[in-house]
């Protein structure tokens, strides 16, 4: 149920107007991009979410609502309410673990997602790379960072192997191990893009695990594993730049030192930070 209003409302107003029987239970602060809170009434639970990035356009939050509205409940929470700065979705019962599931199980989830109808908007990385450069702390910008940005701008993004709806933030903290199987939460970066971009973006523990995930996916998708791995590798520089830039952007927004540490580690992987 989308509800349009130009006037933001408070949490208490949201609950009293739309969920008067519900009461807050707990707050989640998992992940690097923010939190949400849980409301409950007679055993029924919903998650109340706000935009993780206060500077992002409202259209980005609306896209997340639209993505959830068209995804099957077997892989994502169903949304119940959208209005400015607020979204209410189903709570997914299950375990959120600190490590990825078996690669074959994860490959099955991603392959099923990629078989769904496209969302209708493309993920393009270059505008984000340029935004993060522009919005970062000037003292943190380096010649190497700018050089890599120009190199990617000239090279352009890899041509998609297959264009599908993507989640784009697959890591252990966004996977719910439910009684009916794996499900994904936090769809704020969802959009249409290359399946290899999704696979490249998974937060794996090591290269061996990454290769196995790609191999398992290739078997399901009937793609030569070597061909898919080559395409995944083409996205690596783009994703490292995306991660490094996002950490720098969040550092300037929040002043949280964890983002500096994560950015420095990412730049070391790219060998562009002196």
Curated annotation (Swiss-Prot):
Keywords: ATP-binding, Kinase, Nucleotide-binding, Transferase. It is an enzyme of class 2 (transferase). GO terms for molecular function: ATP binding; thiamine kinase activity. Its EC number is 2.7.1.89. One of its GO terms (biological process) is thiamine metabolic process. It holds the Pfam family APH. SUPFAM superfamilies: Protein kinase-like (PK-like). It catalyses: thiamine + ATP = thiamine phosphate + ADP + H(+). Catalyzes the ATP-dependent phosphorylation of thiamine to thiamine phosphate. Is involved in thiamine salvage. This is Thiamine kinase. It comes from Shigella flexneri. The lineage of its organism: Bacteria, Pseudomonadati, Pseudomonadota, Gammaproteobacteria, Enterobacterales. The gene is thiK.
């Amino acid at each position: 149920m989308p509800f349009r209003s130009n006037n933001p409302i408070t949490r208490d107003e949201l609950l009293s107007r739309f969920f008067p029987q519900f009461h807050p239970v707990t707050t989640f602060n998992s992940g690097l991009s923010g939190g949400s809170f849980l409301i409950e009434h007679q055993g029924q639970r919903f998650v109340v979410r706000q935009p993780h990035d206060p500077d992002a356009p409202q259209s980005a939050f609306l896209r997340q609502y639209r993505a959830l509205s068209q995804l099957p409940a077997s892989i994502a929470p169903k949304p119940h309410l959208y209005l400015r700065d607020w979204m209410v979705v189903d709570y997914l019962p299950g375990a959120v673990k600190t490590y990825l599931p078996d690669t074959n199980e994860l490959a099955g989830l991603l392959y099923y997602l990629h078989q769904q109808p496209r969302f209708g908007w493309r993920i393009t990385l270059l505008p984000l790379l340029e935004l993060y450069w522009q919005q970062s702390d000037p003292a943190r910008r380096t010649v190497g960072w700018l050089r890599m940005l120009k190199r990617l701008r000239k090279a352009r993004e890899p041509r998609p192997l297959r264009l599908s709806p993507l989640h784009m933030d697959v890591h252990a903290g966004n996977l719910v191990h439910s009684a009916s199987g794996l499900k994904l939460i936090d769809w704020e970066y969802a959009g249409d893009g290359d399946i290899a971009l999704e696979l490249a973006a998974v937060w794996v523990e090591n290269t061996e695990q990454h290769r196995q995930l790609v191999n398992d996916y290739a078997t399901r998708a009937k793609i030569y594993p070597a061909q898919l791995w080559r395409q995944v590798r083409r996205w690596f520089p783009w994703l490292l730049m995306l991660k490094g830039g996002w950490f720098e952007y969040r550092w300037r927004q929040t002043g949280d030192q964890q983002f500096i540490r994560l950015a420095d580690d990412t730049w070391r992987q790219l060998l562009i930070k002196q």
